[in-house]
Amino acid sequence: MRQTTISKSPRVEVVDALRGFAVLAILLVHHVEHFIYPVYPDPAALPGWLNVLNEGVFTVVFGLFAGKSYSIFALLFGFTFYIQYTNQLAKGKDFSYRFLWRLLLLTLFATLNAAFYPAGDVLLLYAIVGIVLFIVRKWSDKAVLITAILFLLQPVEWYHYIASLFNPDHQLPDLGVGAMYTEMAEHTKRGDLWNFIWQNVTLGQKASLLWAVGAGRYVQTCGLFMLGMLIGRRKLFVPSEANTRFWIKTLIVTAIAFGPLYQIKVLLMDTADSAIVRQTAGVVFDMWQKFAFTFVLVASFVLLYQWEGFKRFTSILRSYGKMSLTNYVSQSFFGALIYFPIGLNLAPYCGYTVSMFIGIAFFFLQVRFCKWWAEHHKHGPLEGIWHKWTWVGSK
């Protein structure tokens, strides 16, 4: 690493707010898509203006946040690893193997989250891919950056695309993801609580992990984790003139890149006749346009956060972000109770617009809980358990 002198890293306010923003964005996406439960009111039974509004809500929420909120979350996961690793190094301790234990604990929270979120959990993916941070923790900045770029290039998809050019019969392996999601929807419709939970933590987790393979999420998450660690090393979230220039340049470059990347994605993924092109080059450009827009969001947020008015406006996101694990898992639990047959079964009565407003209302309830909890506790409920168990056996 570059640093020759190790000092404890202070808490960076913008990171908590940005994490809160990411969890809020995830919440809105989850509510609009009914937590991957595709049951909605019949459009024919709704007034025309509401159908138009519903389509607009879906387009805006998914266009702004789908695939980007998780990317922000992944960046901050890598950043948090750097902070924890550096803080322990400042005390003369090696956090490396404690971090592996922490990842193992994360699988427990992933199971808890998956129990009420059919095939939608991302925490298990993070627990698996997080091992890459352990591997590169002592690498130089240059080595980490080069490796991150290689991952972000989506090499697996390019391999299959190039192979298809030489062999027209080349096909991606059929992982059966579509059939798994169909089966998960049927289990959800049954309304049998214990069957619902069991299928979610078994078949659902399998479907989620295999979906991530086809969507290019594994290698992208590796790259994002490493970029987050580099952001920590370079202290790019700490306010300074140099960092402001960096984020302005990042905003300009990624905003310019997003347009053509998105158009190529439409050509290759949405309208291409060849399935192999859609599943390979199409996926690559889909991930790249999402990556570019992710940094448009991050850079914009960091730059706006230097303005006191924006900082006050987003103050509720800081407390929300400090309890991101609790808020992420609890939204799955309550989402199941709201939309699924095991609970109120409101999915057939809630279109995109109503679902979005339910999500917004639930966000404010979570914020209220976060503020109340923070008055009495240092960590959120799940954060406190994770912290306590992380350091079990330490002196």
Regions found by a protein language model. Name each.
Residues R11-L18, A22-V23, I248-L251, Y305-F334, ...:
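Functional transmembrane helices that form membrane-embedded active or gating regions
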Residues S71-T86, V122-I135, G216-P239, Q289-E308:
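Specific transmembrane alpha-helix
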Residues I276-E375:
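Alpha-helical transmembrane segments of multi-pass integral membrane proteins
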Residues W49-G63, L193-L210, A272-T280:
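Juxtamembrane membrane-water interface segments that cap and precede transmembrane helices
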Residues Y82-H160:
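Internal alpha-helical transmembrane segments
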Residues R2-F77:
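N-terminal signal-anchor module of multipass membrane proteins
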Residues L150-M229:
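Long hydrophobic alpha-helical segments that form multi-pass transmembrane helix bundles
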